[in-house]
Amino acid sequence: MLKSISMLNIVIFGKPGSGKGTQATLIKDNYDLIHISTGDVFRKNISDGTELGKTATQFMSKGELVPDTITISMLEQEIKDFVPCNGFIFDGFPRTILQAKSLDELLDNMNLKIDIVVALEVENNVLTKRLLERGKTSGRSDDQSEVKINKRLDEYDKKTKPLVNFYKKQEKFVSIDGVGEFDQVTDRLITTLD
């Protein structure tokens, strides 16, 4: 489907526990893309002591969300650091319509665009089971409580699910069954991307 595109830019999203981080890494390796995880970008800016990292830390130390403008500025710098390349896979961003519009504008200003948006679809009962199992070894407290897991899934539905219609209108949205062995899901993704 997208093999003829010289630079492939993908957004991958899905509910917590859907396997998006694992699949993003596998797809990155398969297509030689740059994996951009907003969490990693934040940690890098903070540990490097950049101005953006310092600003983000000020918000985070007060328990406040970092404004989208700061996040977009970090992403812009990250993208500039790697262009030219084969493309990017964005993992964990965008999460809201406003972020999606900001990302589109940022990429448009750099003569780039999102080519495809892939959502890994998994039923909530399967996700809860996966996350509780992961919580046994991850050490993440939000993976160890069914109440916290349900809150995260509800948060996703409220904030991130509206992105489906946003990207459907752009004819970029594809839904992939995220249930099964990792390699089965990867095969479905590669079939869609090829």
Per-region residue spans from a language model:
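Glycine-rich phosphate-binding loop of ATP-dependent small-molecule kinases
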Residues: 1-194
